[in-house]
Amino acid sequence: MKLNYFQGALYPWRFCVIVGLLLAMVGAIVWRIVDLHVIDHDFLKGQGDARSVRHIAIPAHRGLITDRNGEPLAVSTPVTTLWANPKELMTAKERWPQLAAALGQDTKLFADRIEQNAEREFIYLVRGLTPEQGEGVIALKVPGVYSIEEFRRFYPAGEVVAHAVGFTDVDDRGREGIELAFDEWLAGVPGKRQVLKDRRGRVIKDVQVTKNAKPGKTLALSIDLRLQYLAHRELRNALLENGAKAGSLVIMDVKTGEILAMTNQPTYNPNNRRNLQPAAMRNRAMIDVFEPGSTVKPFSMSAALASGRWKPSDIVDVYPGTLQIGRYTIRDVSRNSRQLDLTGILIKSSNVGISKIAFDIGAESIYSVMQQVGLGQDTGLGFPGERVGNLPNHRKWPKAETATLAYGYGLSVTAIQLAHAYAALANDGKSVPLSMTRVDRVPDGVQVISPEVASTVQGMLQQVVEAQGGVFRAQVPGYHAAGKSGTARKVSVGTKGYRENAYRSLFAGFAPATDPRIAMVVVIDEPSKAGYFGGLVSAPVFSKVMAGALRLMNVPPDNLPTATEQQQVNAAPAKGGRG
Protein backbone atom coordinates (compact mmCIF):
# COMPACT_ATOMS: atom_id res chain seq x y z
CA MET A 1 0.00 0.00 0.00
CA LYS A 2 2.89 2.45 0.76
CA LEU A 3 4.41 1.86 -2.68
CA ASN A 4 1.15 2.74 -4.41
CA TYR A 5 0.83 5.91 -2.32
CA PHE A 6 4.26 7.18 -3.18
CA GLN A 7 3.78 6.30 -6.86
CA GLY A 8 0.50 8.20 -6.97
CA ALA A 9 2.12 11.24 -5.37
CA LEU A 10 5.24 11.16 -7.59
CA TYR A 11 3.67 11.03 -11.06
CA PRO A 12 1.70 14.31 -10.84
CA TRP A 13 4.87 16.06 -9.68
CA ARG A 14 6.86 14.76 -12.66
CA PHE A 15 4.08 15.70 -14.99
CA CYS A 16 4.06 19.26 -13.69
CA VAL A 17 7.83 19.58 -14.10
CA ILE A 18 7.75 18.33 -17.65
CA VAL A 19 4.85 20.53 -18.60
CA GLY A 20 6.57 23.50 -16.95
CA LEU A 21 9.76 22.90 -18.88
CA LEU A 22 7.86 22.60 -22.13
CA LEU A 23 5.97 25.79 -21.42
CA ALA A 24 9.24 27.55 -20.56
CA MET A 25 10.83 26.42 -23.80
CA VAL A 26 7.83 27.53 -25.81
CA GLY A 27 7.86 30.85 -23.98
CA ALA A 28 11.55 31.31 -24.70
CA ILE A 29 11.01 30.58 -28.36
CA VAL A 30 8.09 32.97 -28.55
CA TRP A 31 10.11 35.64 -26.75
CA ARG A 32 13.04 35.19 -29.13
CA ILE A 33 10.71 35.47 -32.11
CA VAL A 34 9.26 38.66 -30.69
CA ASP A 35 12.77 39.91 -29.91
CA LEU A 36 14.04 39.26 -33.43
CA HIS A 37 11.02 40.56 -35.31
CA VAL A 38 10.02 43.46 -33.14
CA ILE A 39 12.56 44.63 -30.58
CA ASP A 40 15.84 44.04 -32.53
CA HIS A 41 14.35 44.24 -36.04
CA ASP A 42 16.08 47.44 -37.10
CA PHE A 43 19.45 46.40 -35.67
CA LEU A 44 19.42 43.00 -37.31
CA LYS A 45 18.21 44.38 -40.63
CA GLY A 46 21.10 46.83 -40.57
CA GLN A 47 23.54 44.02 -39.84
CA GLY A 48 22.15 41.97 -42.71
CA ASP A 49 22.26 44.87 -45.10
CA ALA A 50 25.83 45.64 -44.09
CA ARG A 51 26.79 42.23 -45.40
CA SER A 52 25.05 42.76 -48.75
CA VAL A 53 24.84 46.55 -49.30
CA ARG A 54 27.83 47.99 -51.10
CA HIS A 55 28.86 51.41 -52.39
CA ILE A 56 29.90 51.46 -56.05
CA ALA A 57 31.70 54.36 -57.68
CA ILE A 58 29.85 56.23 -60.41
CA PRO A 59 32.50 57.18 -62.99
CA ALA A 60 32.79 60.85 -63.92
CA HIS A 61 33.99 61.72 -67.40
CA ARG A 62 36.83 64.19 -68.00
CA GLY A 63 36.09 67.61 -69.33
CA LEU A 64 35.99 68.25 -73.05
CA ILE A 65 39.07 69.83 -74.67
CA THR A 66 38.28 71.99 -77.69
CA ASP A 67 40.13 74.30 -80.01
CA ARG A 68 39.42 78.03 -79.87
CA ASN A 69 36.36 77.60 -82.11
CA GLY A 70 34.79 74.73 -80.17
CA GLU A 71 36.09 71.88 -82.33
CA PRO A 72 36.59 68.81 -80.08
CA LEU A 73 40.20 67.78 -79.51
CA ALA A 74 39.67 65.33 -76.63
CA VAL A 75 36.40 63.67 -75.67
CA SER A 76 35.44 60.95 -73.19
CA THR A 77 33.54 57.94 -74.49
CA PRO A 78 31.87 55.24 -72.32
CA VAL A 79 33.66 51.90 -72.27
CA THR A 80 33.24 48.61 -70.44
CA THR A 81 35.92 47.02 -68.31
CA LEU A 82 35.64 43.30 -67.53
CA TRP A 83 36.98 41.86 -64.30
CA ALA A 84 36.89 38.46 -62.66
CA ASN A 85 36.88 36.79 -59.27
CA PRO A 86 39.41 33.98 -59.86
CA LYS A 87 38.06 31.97 -56.92
CA GLU A 88 34.69 31.73 -58.65
CA LEU A 89 36.18 31.37 -62.10
CA MET A 90 38.16 28.33 -60.94
CA THR A 91 34.86 26.47 -60.57
CA ALA A 92 34.07 26.85 -64.25
CA LYS A 93 37.25 25.71 -66.00
CA GLU A 94 35.24 24.12 -68.78
CA ARG A 95 34.09 27.62 -69.80
CA TRP A 96 37.60 29.10 -70.04
CA PRO A 97 38.18 28.38 -73.77
CA GLN A 98 34.88 30.04 -74.64
CA LEU A 99 35.69 33.06 -72.44
CA ALA A 100 39.24 33.40 -73.77
CA ALA A 101 37.96 33.32 -77.34
CA ALA A 102 35.38 36.02 -76.56
CA LEU A 103 38.13 38.17 -75.07
CA GLY A 104 40.44 37.57 -78.03
CA GLN A 105 43.08 36.00 -75.81
CA ASP A 106 45.17 32.86 -76.07
CA THR A 107 43.48 30.06 -74.10
CA LYS A 108 46.66 28.77 -72.46
CA LEU A 109 47.88 32.23 -71.46
CA PHE A 110 44.42 33.01 -70.10
CA ALA A 111 44.34 29.80 -68.06
CA ASP A 112 47.84 30.38 -66.69
CA ARG A 113 46.89 33.88 -65.58
CA ILE A 114 43.75 32.72 -63.76
CA GLU A 115 45.59 29.89 -62.01
CA GLN A 116 48.39 32.22 -60.92
CA ASN A 117 45.80 34.46 -59.28
CA ALA A 118 43.55 31.69 -57.98
CA GLU A 119 43.60 32.99 -54.39
CA ARG A 120 42.66 36.53 -55.34
CA GLU A 121 39.16 37.94 -55.59
CA PHE A 122 39.77 40.59 -58.25
CA ILE A 123 41.74 40.83 -61.47
CA TYR A 124 41.13 42.81 -64.65
CA LEU A 125 40.34 40.70 -67.69
CA VAL A 126 40.30 43.48 -70.28
CA ARG A 127 39.73 47.24 -70.19
CA GLY A 128 38.30 49.69 -72.65
CA LEU A 129 35.84 47.53 -74.57
CA THR A 130 32.91 49.11 -76.32
CA PRO A 131 29.65 48.65 -74.39
CA GLU A 132 28.47 46.23 -77.10
CA GLN A 133 31.62 44.10 -76.76
CA GLY A 134 31.29 44.06 -72.99
CA GLU A 135 27.64 43.02 -73.13
CA GLY A 136 28.54 40.19 -75.47
CA VAL A 137 31.00 38.70 -72.96
CA ILE A 138 28.70 39.19 -69.97
CA ALA A 139 25.91 37.47 -71.92
CA LEU A 140 27.96 34.24 -71.77
CA LYS A 141 27.14 34.14 -68.03
CA VAL A 142 30.48 32.69 -67.04
CA PRO A 143 30.62 32.47 -63.22
CA GLY A 144 32.97 35.03 -61.69
CA VAL A 145 33.01 37.45 -64.66
CA TYR A 146 31.69 40.98 -64.07
CA SER A 147 31.75 44.41 -65.71
CA ILE A 148 32.46 48.01 -64.71
CA GLU A 149 31.42 51.09 -66.65
CA GLU A 150 34.28 53.54 -67.25
CA PHE A 151 35.33 56.27 -69.68
CA ARG A 152 38.16 56.34 -72.21
CA ARG A 153 39.66 59.36 -73.94
CA PHE A 154 39.35 59.73 -77.71
CA TYR A 155 41.24 62.30 -79.78
CA PRO A 156 39.36 63.23 -82.99
CA ALA A 157 42.32 65.09 -84.55
CA GLY A 158 44.73 62.24 -83.82
CA GLU A 159 48.38 62.94 -84.61
CA VAL A 160 47.72 66.47 -85.87
CA VAL A 161 47.52 67.98 -82.39
CA ALA A 162 49.05 65.16 -80.33
CA HIS A 163 51.95 67.08 -78.80
CA ALA A 164 49.76 69.94 -77.64
CA VAL A 165 46.85 67.93 -76.23
CA GLY A 166 48.79 64.93 -74.92
CA PHE A 167 46.94 61.88 -73.60
CA THR A 168 45.64 60.06 -70.52
CA ASP A 169 46.55 56.67 -69.08
CA VAL A 170 44.30 53.64 -68.66
CA ASP A 171 42.94 55.14 -65.42
CA ASP A 172 41.97 58.35 -67.25
CA ARG A 173 44.66 60.49 -65.63
CA GLY A 174 46.61 63.03 -67.65
CA ARG A 175 50.07 61.84 -68.64
CA GLU A 176 51.27 64.26 -71.35
CA GLY A 177 50.57 67.71 -72.73
CA ILE A 178 47.47 69.69 -71.82
CA GLU A 179 45.90 66.54 -70.37
CA LEU A 180 48.64 66.56 -67.73
CA ALA A 181 49.07 70.32 -67.30
CA PHE A 182 45.32 70.81 -66.68
CA ASP A 183 44.60 67.41 -65.13
CA GLU A 184 42.94 68.85 -62.01
CA TRP A 185 40.69 71.09 -64.12
CA LEU A 186 39.70 68.32 -66.52
CA ALA A 187 39.32 65.45 -64.05
CA GLY A 188 35.81 64.71 -62.86
CA VAL A 189 34.81 63.73 -59.32
CA PRO A 190 33.32 60.20 -59.13
CA GLY A 191 29.95 59.73 -57.47
CA LYS A 192 28.63 56.87 -55.32
CA ARG A 193 25.61 54.62 -55.48
CA GLN A 194 24.32 52.14 -52.92
CA VAL A 195 23.49 48.66 -54.23
CA LEU A 196 22.55 45.22 -52.94
CA LYS A 197 24.80 42.38 -54.02
CA ASP A 198 24.37 38.64 -53.81
CA ARG A 199 26.97 36.29 -52.40
CA ARG A 200 28.73 36.21 -55.76
CA GLY A 201 29.10 39.97 -55.84
CA ARG A 202 26.47 40.55 -58.49
CA VAL A 203 24.30 43.64 -58.18
CA ILE A 204 20.72 42.57 -57.58
CA LYS A 205 19.22 45.93 -56.68
CA ASP A 206 20.05 49.63 -56.95
CA VAL A 207 19.21 51.21 -53.60
CA GLN A 208 20.05 54.89 -54.06
CA VAL A 209 22.59 57.40 -55.36
CA THR A 210 24.43 58.79 -52.36
CA LYS A 211 26.68 61.17 -54.30
CA ASN A 212 26.24 62.41 -57.84
CA ALA A 213 29.22 62.23 -60.20
CA LYS A 214 30.65 65.60 -61.13
CA PRO A 215 32.07 65.75 -64.68
CA GLY A 216 35.29 67.61 -65.43
CA LYS A 217 35.29 71.13 -66.82
CA THR A 218 35.55 72.02 -70.49
CA LEU A 219 38.83 73.60 -71.61
CA ALA A 220 39.09 75.76 -74.74
CA LEU A 221 42.63 75.90 -76.11
CA SER A 222 44.18 78.76 -78.05
CA ILE A 223 44.84 76.33 -80.91
CA ASP A 224 42.98 76.97 -84.16
CA LEU A 225 42.48 73.50 -85.63
CA ARG A 226 42.35 74.88 -89.18
CA LEU A 227 45.81 76.44 -88.79
CA GLN A 228 47.03 73.33 -86.98
CA TYR A 229 46.08 71.08 -89.90
CA LEU A 230 47.76 73.47 -92.33
CA ALA A 231 50.97 73.67 -90.30
CA HIS A 232 51.04 69.89 -89.77
CA ARG A 233 50.69 69.18 -93.49
CA GLU A 234 53.29 71.66 -94.69
CA LEU A 235 55.85 70.71 -92.03
CA ARG A 236 55.47 67.03 -92.87
CA ASN A 237 55.88 67.76 -96.57
CA ALA A 238 58.97 69.89 -95.89
CA LEU A 239 60.65 67.06 -93.99
CA LEU A 240 59.99 64.65 -96.85
CA GLU A 241 61.22 67.10 -99.50
CA ASN A 242 64.42 67.92 -97.61
CA GLY A 243 65.19 64.51 -96.13
CA ALA A 244 65.14 66.05 -92.67
CA LYS A 245 65.25 64.29 -89.33
CA ALA A 246 62.68 66.37 -87.44
CA GLY A 247 60.99 69.75 -87.35
CA SER A 248 58.77 72.18 -85.46
CA LEU A 249 56.43 75.00 -86.41
CA VAL A 250 54.81 77.53 -84.08
CA ILE A 251 52.20 80.20 -84.90
CA MET A 252 51.37 82.94 -82.39
CA ASP A 253 48.88 85.79 -82.19
CA VAL A 254 51.12 88.81 -81.62
CA LYS A 255 48.38 90.80 -79.84
CA THR A 256 47.11 88.18 -77.38
CA GLY A 257 50.07 85.84 -76.91
CA GLU A 258 47.91 82.85 -77.90
CA ILE A 259 49.61 79.89 -79.52
CA LEU A 260 47.42 79.30 -82.58
CA ALA A 261 49.32 76.27 -83.86
CA MET A 262 52.16 74.13 -82.57
CA THR A 263 53.20 71.08 -84.52
CA ASN A 264 56.20 68.77 -84.56
CA GLN A 265 57.54 65.98 -86.72
CA PRO A 266 57.77 63.09 -86.10
CA THR A 267 54.46 62.78 -84.29
CA TYR A 268 52.21 59.96 -83.04
CA ASN A 269 48.57 58.88 -82.86
CA PRO A 270 47.33 59.21 -79.25
CA ASN A 271 44.44 56.85 -80.04
CA ASN A 272 46.86 54.00 -80.77
CA ARG A 273 50.07 54.11 -78.77
CA ARG A 274 51.23 50.56 -79.41
CA ASN A 275 54.87 50.39 -80.48
CA LEU A 276 55.21 54.11 -79.79
CA GLN A 277 58.75 55.44 -80.18
CA PRO A 278 59.99 57.98 -77.58
CA ALA A 279 61.29 60.28 -80.33
CA ALA A 280 57.77 60.66 -81.71
CA MET A 281 56.48 61.85 -78.33
CA ARG A 282 58.91 64.77 -78.07
CA ASN A 283 57.18 68.12 -78.08
CA ARG A 284 60.19 69.60 -79.83
CA ALA A 285 58.78 73.12 -79.95
CA MET A 286 59.03 73.26 -76.16
CA ILE A 287 61.65 70.65 -75.29
CA ASP A 288 64.39 70.92 -77.91
CA VAL A 289 66.83 73.77 -77.31
CA PHE A 290 69.15 75.06 -80.03
CA GLU A 291 71.41 77.94 -80.91
CA PRO A 292 69.17 80.33 -82.88
CA GLY A 293 71.89 81.67 -85.16
CA SER A 294 71.06 84.66 -87.33
CA THR A 295 67.40 84.75 -86.26
CA VAL A 296 68.46 86.80 -83.20
CA LYS A 297 70.30 89.47 -85.19
CA PRO A 298 67.17 91.69 -85.19
CA PHE A 299 67.39 91.86 -81.39
CA SER A 300 71.07 92.78 -81.53
CA MET A 301 70.07 95.48 -84.01
CA SER A 302 67.31 96.62 -81.64
CA ALA A 303 69.91 97.06 -78.91
CA ALA A 304 72.09 99.11 -81.27
CA LEU A 305 69.24 101.44 -82.24
CA ALA A 306 68.10 101.76 -78.61
CA SER A 307 71.62 102.77 -77.55
CA GLY A 308 71.36 105.99 -79.57
CA ARG A 309 74.79 105.33 -81.05
CA TRP A 310 73.45 103.87 -84.29
CA LYS A 311 70.83 104.77 -86.88
CA PRO A 312 69.64 102.75 -89.90
CA SER A 313 71.66 104.76 -92.42
CA ASP A 314 75.00 104.22 -90.66
CA ILE A 315 77.59 102.31 -92.67
CA VAL A 316 79.73 99.38 -91.49
CA ASP A 317 82.77 98.15 -93.41
CA VAL A 318 82.48 94.36 -93.66
CA TYR A 319 85.26 93.76 -96.20
CA PRO A 320 86.74 91.17 -96.75
CA GLY A 321 83.97 89.16 -95.06
CA THR A 322 86.16 87.93 -92.20
CA LEU A 323 87.21 89.38 -88.87
CA GLN A 324 90.00 88.00 -86.70
CA ILE A 325 89.46 88.04 -82.92
CA GLY A 326 92.54 86.48 -81.37
CA ARG A 327 92.56 82.89 -82.54
CA TYR A 328 88.89 83.07 -83.53
CA THR A 329 87.81 84.05 -87.06
CA ILE A 330 84.37 85.50 -87.72
CA ARG A 331 83.17 84.73 -91.24
CA ASP A 332 80.34 85.88 -93.47
CA VAL A 333 78.67 83.44 -95.84
CA SER A 334 78.57 86.17 -98.49
CA ARG A 335 81.95 87.88 -98.86
CA ASN A 336 81.27 90.11 -101.85
CA SER A 337 80.12 93.11 -99.83
CA ARG A 338 82.29 96.03 -98.73
CA GLN A 339 80.07 98.49 -96.92
CA LEU A 340 76.59 97.85 -95.59
CA ASP A 341 74.05 99.97 -93.78
CA LEU A 342 72.18 98.39 -90.87
CA THR A 343 69.40 97.05 -93.08
CA GLY A 344 72.01 95.63 -95.46
CA ILE A 345 73.66 93.82 -92.54
CA LEU A 346 70.38 92.01 -91.88
CA ILE A 347 69.69 91.35 -95.57
CA LYS A 348 73.16 89.89 -96.12
CA SER A 349 73.14 88.33 -92.63
CA SER A 350 76.63 89.68 -92.02
CA ASN A 351 78.29 88.22 -88.94
CA VAL A 352 81.15 90.68 -89.36
CA GLY A 353 78.83 93.67 -89.50
CA ILE A 354 76.73 92.71 -86.46
CA SER A 355 79.89 91.84 -84.51
CA LYS A 356 81.39 95.29 -85.09
CA ILE A 357 78.18 96.88 -83.87
CA ALA A 358 78.20 94.60 -80.82
CA PHE A 359 81.78 95.63 -79.97
CA ASP A 360 80.65 99.25 -80.02
CA ILE A 361 77.52 98.97 -77.85
CA GLY A 362 78.70 96.15 -75.56
CA ALA A 363 77.28 92.69 -74.95
CA GLU A 364 75.35 93.87 -71.88
CA SER A 365 72.88 95.87 -73.96
CA ILE A 366 72.31 92.96 -76.35
CA TYR A 367 71.89 90.58 -73.43
CA SER A 368 69.33 92.92 -71.87
CA VAL A 369 67.15 93.01 -74.99
CA MET A 370 67.33 89.25 -75.47
CA GLN A 371 66.41 88.66 -71.85
CA GLN A 372 63.46 91.04 -71.98
CA VAL A 373 61.98 89.45 -75.10
CA GLY A 374 62.16 86.04 -73.39
CA LEU A 375 65.07 84.24 -75.02
CA GLY A 376 66.46 81.62 -72.64
CA GLN A 377 63.77 82.52 -70.08
CA ASP A 378 60.85 80.67 -68.49
CA THR A 379 57.78 81.18 -70.68
CA GLY A 380 55.34 80.85 -67.79
CA LEU A 381 53.25 78.27 -69.66
CA GLY A 382 53.89 75.53 -67.11
CA PHE A 383 53.84 72.96 -69.88
CA PRO A 384 55.10 69.48 -68.87
CA GLY A 385 58.73 68.95 -69.79
CA GLU A 386 59.25 72.46 -71.17
CA ARG A 387 62.88 73.56 -71.14
CA VAL A 388 64.18 77.04 -70.47
CA GLY A 389 67.36 77.07 -72.53
CA ASN A 390 70.26 79.29 -71.60
CA LEU A 391 71.13 82.96 -72.04
CA PRO A 392 74.64 83.39 -70.60
CA ASN A 393 75.49 86.47 -68.60
CA HIS A 394 79.21 86.97 -68.11
CA ARG A 395 80.53 89.33 -65.48
CA LYS A 396 83.03 90.46 -68.08
CA TRP A 397 82.30 89.77 -71.74
CA PRO A 398 85.27 88.70 -73.89
CA LYS A 399 85.22 89.95 -77.46
CA ALA A 400 84.60 86.52 -78.97
CA GLU A 401 81.57 85.88 -76.71
CA THR A 402 80.24 89.36 -77.48
CA ALA A 403 80.36 88.61 -81.20
CA THR A 404 78.82 85.14 -80.97
CA LEU A 405 75.97 86.43 -78.78
CA ALA A 406 75.20 89.09 -81.39
CA TYR A 407 74.80 86.55 -84.20
CA GLY A 408 73.12 83.80 -82.21
CA TYR A 409 75.71 81.38 -80.89
CA GLY A 410 76.55 80.59 -77.28
CA LEU A 411 72.90 80.78 -76.19
CA SER A 412 70.12 78.21 -76.48
CA VAL A 413 66.40 78.76 -76.95
CA THR A 414 63.24 76.85 -77.86
CA ALA A 415 61.01 77.44 -80.87
CA ILE A 416 58.29 78.75 -78.54
CA GLN A 417 60.68 81.32 -77.03
CA LEU A 418 61.83 82.48 -80.45
CA ALA A 419 58.22 82.88 -81.62
CA HIS A 420 57.41 84.83 -78.45
CA ALA A 421 60.37 87.15 -79.05
CA TYR A 422 59.31 87.84 -82.65
CA ALA A 423 55.73 88.40 -81.51
CA ALA A 424 56.95 91.11 -79.12
CA LEU A 425 58.90 92.77 -81.93
CA ALA A 426 55.85 92.60 -84.21
CA ASN A 427 53.59 93.98 -81.46
CA ASP A 428 55.45 97.32 -81.48
CA GLY A 429 57.86 96.11 -78.83
CA LYS A 430 55.21 95.00 -76.35
CA SER A 431 55.47 91.46 -74.95
CA VAL A 432 52.27 89.78 -73.76
CA PRO A 433 52.15 86.52 -71.75
CA LEU A 434 52.04 83.29 -73.70
CA SER A 435 48.88 81.22 -73.50
CA MET A 436 47.86 77.72 -74.56
CA THR A 437 44.22 78.47 -73.67
CA ARG A 438 41.85 80.80 -75.46
CA VAL A 439 42.19 84.44 -74.42
CA ASP A 440 38.93 86.39 -74.46
CA ARG A 441 40.43 89.71 -73.42
CA VAL A 442 43.69 91.19 -74.72
CA PRO A 443 46.11 90.97 -71.77
CA ASP A 444 48.28 93.79 -70.55
CA GLY A 445 51.76 93.63 -72.01
CA VAL A 446 55.19 94.86 -71.04
CA GLN A 447 57.07 97.30 -73.28
CA VAL A 448 60.38 95.50 -73.82
CA ILE A 449 61.50 97.43 -76.92
CA SER A 450 60.51 101.02 -77.58
CA PRO A 451 57.76 101.41 -80.23
CA GLU A 452 60.08 103.56 -82.36
CA VAL A 453 62.87 100.98 -82.38
CA ALA A 454 60.43 98.12 -82.94
CA SER A 455 58.87 99.92 -85.91
CA THR A 456 62.29 100.55 -87.44
CA VAL A 457 63.36 96.92 -87.09
CA GLN A 458 60.02 95.77 -88.52
CA GLY A 459 60.79 97.79 -91.63
CA MET A 460 64.27 96.30 -91.84
CA LEU A 461 62.90 92.77 -91.62
CA GLN A 462 60.38 93.54 -94.34
CA GLN A 463 63.33 94.49 -96.55
CA VAL A 464 65.06 91.21 -95.61
CA VAL A 465 62.15 89.40 -97.25
CA GLU A 466 61.32 91.78 -100.10
CA ALA A 467 64.59 93.45 -101.15
CA GLN A 468 66.76 92.15 -103.97
CA GLY A 469 69.17 89.56 -102.57
CA GLY A 470 66.91 88.94 -99.59
CA VAL A 471 65.04 85.83 -98.52
CA PHE A 472 62.58 85.92 -101.41
CA ARG A 473 61.33 82.39 -100.69
CA ALA A 474 59.68 83.76 -97.56
CA GLN A 475 57.52 86.18 -99.53
CA VAL A 476 53.82 85.66 -98.88
CA PRO A 477 51.52 86.07 -101.90
CA GLY A 478 49.16 88.96 -101.29
CA TYR A 479 50.82 90.16 -98.10
CA HIS A 480 53.86 92.09 -96.97
CA ALA A 481 55.92 89.83 -94.71
CA ALA A 482 58.93 90.39 -92.48
CA GLY A 483 61.41 87.96 -91.02
CA LYS A 484 64.89 86.58 -90.73
CA SER A 485 66.42 83.26 -91.70
CA GLY A 486 69.01 81.42 -89.68
CA THR A 487 71.28 78.43 -90.09
CA ALA A 488 72.78 76.96 -86.93
CA ARG A 489 75.34 74.22 -86.65
CA LYS A 490 74.40 71.44 -84.25
CA VAL A 491 76.44 70.96 -81.12
CA SER A 492 78.24 67.64 -80.81
CA VAL A 493 76.87 65.60 -77.90
CA GLY A 494 79.57 64.31 -75.57
CA THR A 495 82.43 66.22 -77.17
CA LYS A 496 83.31 69.87 -77.62
CA GLY A 497 82.56 71.67 -80.83
CA TYR A 498 80.05 71.09 -83.60
CA ARG A 499 79.04 68.13 -85.70
CA GLU A 500 80.11 67.95 -89.30
CA ASN A 501 77.36 68.63 -91.85
CA ALA A 502 74.61 68.79 -89.21
CA TYR A 503 72.47 71.95 -89.25
CA ARG A 504 69.17 73.37 -88.12
CA SER A 505 67.48 75.48 -90.74
CA LEU A 506 65.40 78.31 -89.26
CA PHE A 507 63.05 81.04 -90.28
CA ALA A 508 61.24 83.44 -87.96
CA GLY A 509 58.92 86.22 -89.05
CA PHE A 510 55.52 87.87 -88.97
CA ALA A 511 52.81 89.22 -91.26
CA PRO A 512 51.23 91.36 -92.50
CA ALA A 513 54.30 93.54 -92.04
CA THR A 514 52.18 96.71 -92.22
CA ASP A 515 49.95 95.57 -89.34
CA PRO A 516 51.29 92.31 -87.87
CA ARG A 517 48.74 89.72 -86.77
CA ILE A 518 50.71 86.50 -86.38
CA ALA A 519 54.31 85.49 -85.80
CA MET A 520 55.75 82.19 -86.94
CA VAL A 521 58.88 80.11 -86.39
CA VAL A 522 59.90 77.18 -88.59
CA VAL A 523 62.66 74.78 -87.51
CA ILE A 524 63.89 72.01 -89.81
CA ASP A 525 66.38 69.65 -88.18
CA GLU A 526 69.19 68.15 -90.28
CA PRO A 527 67.97 68.60 -93.86
CA SER A 528 70.01 66.32 -96.11
CA LYS A 529 68.95 66.89 -99.72
CA ALA A 530 69.00 70.22 -101.57
CA GLY A 531 70.74 72.34 -98.94
CA TYR A 532 70.60 73.50 -95.37
CA PHE A 533 70.33 77.32 -95.32
CA GLY A 534 67.26 78.58 -93.47
CA GLY A 535 66.29 80.79 -96.40
CA LEU A 536 66.34 77.78 -98.70
CA VAL A 537 64.70 75.13 -96.49
CA SER A 538 62.49 76.83 -93.88
CA ALA A 539 61.49 80.05 -95.66
CA PRO A 540 59.22 78.28 -98.20
CA VAL A 541 57.35 76.60 -95.34
CA PHE A 542 56.86 80.01 -93.71
CA SER A 543 55.52 81.37 -97.00
CA LYS A 544 52.98 78.59 -97.57
CA VAL A 545 51.71 78.38 -94.00
CA MET A 546 51.58 82.15 -93.50
CA ALA A 547 49.60 82.64 -96.72
CA GLY A 548 47.10 79.96 -95.76
CA ALA A 549 46.82 81.10 -92.14
CA LEU A 550 46.11 84.74 -93.00
CA ARG A 551 43.40 83.72 -95.44
CA LEU A 552 41.82 81.34 -92.93
CA MET A 553 41.80 84.19 -90.42
CA ASN A 554 40.18 86.50 -92.99
CA VAL A 555 43.05 89.00 -92.82
CA PRO A 556 42.71 91.35 -95.83
CA PRO A 557 45.64 91.21 -98.29
CA ASP A 558 47.87 94.29 -98.23
CA ASN A 559 50.16 93.50 -101.16
CA LEU A 560 48.30 92.09 -104.12
CA PRO A 561 50.85 91.88 -106.98
CA THR A 562 50.25 92.97 -110.53
CA ALA A 563 50.44 90.35 -113.25
CA THR A 564 53.89 91.61 -114.29
CA GLU A 565 55.23 91.46 -110.75
CA GLN A 566 53.95 87.91 -110.31
CA GLN A 567 55.74 86.80 -113.49
CA GLN A 568 58.98 88.35 -112.24
CA VAL A 569 58.71 86.51 -108.92
CA ASN A 570 58.09 83.18 -110.67
CA ALA A 571 61.09 83.72 -112.95
CA ALA A 572 63.47 84.82 -110.18
CA PRO A 573 66.77 82.86 -110.11
CA ALA A 574 67.36 80.47 -107.21
CA LYS A 575 69.68 82.61 -105.13
CA GLY A 576 69.54 84.42 -101.82
CA GLY A 577 68.19 83.03 -98.59
CA ARG A 578 71.40 83.05 -96.58
CA GLY A 579 71.33 82.14 -92.93
Swiss-Prot record:
Note the superkingdom of the native organism.
Bacteria
Which Gene Ontology cellular component annotation is one that this UniProt entry carries? plasma membrane
Q: In its UniProt entry, what is this protein called?
A: Peptidoglycan D,D-transpeptidase FtsI
Q: Which reaction does it catalyse?
A: Preferential cleavage: (Ac)2-L-Lys-D-Ala-|-D-Ala. Also transpeptidation of peptidyl-alanyl moieties that are N-acyl substituents of D-alanine
Q: Which HAMAP family match?
A: FtsI_transpept
Compartments annotated for it: namely: Cell inner membrane
| Pfam families linked to this entry | PBP_dimer, Transpeptidase
| Induction of its expression | Mainly produced during exponential phase of growth.
Q: Where is the active site?
A: 294 (acyl-ester intermediate)
Q: How does it sit in the membrane?
A: Single-pass membrane protein
Purpose of the protein: Catalyzes cross-linking of the peptidoglycan cell wall at the division septum. Binds penicillin.
Which terms under GO biological process does the entry name? cell wall organization; division septum assembly; FtsZ-dependent cytokinesis; peptidoglycan biosynthetic process; proteolysis; regulation of cell shape
One GO molecular-function annotation for this sequence? penicillin binding
Taxonomy-wise, where does this protein's organism fall, top ranks first? Bacteria, Pseudomonadati, Pseudomonadota, Gammaproteobacteria, Pseudomonadales
Gene it is expressed from:
ftsI
**Pathway the protein takes part in:** Cell wall biogenesis; peptidoglycan biosynthesis
InterPro entries (UniProt xref): Bact_Transpept/Beta-Lactamase, Beta-lactam/transpept-like, FtsI_transpept, PBP_dimer, PBP_dimer_sf, PCN-bd_Tpept
Q: Which residues form a coiled coil?
A: none
State which Enzyme Commission number(s) the record gives: 3.4.16.4
Segments carrying the region annotation (Disordered) are: 558-579
Protein family according to the UniProt entry: Belongs to the transpeptidase family. FtsI subfamily.
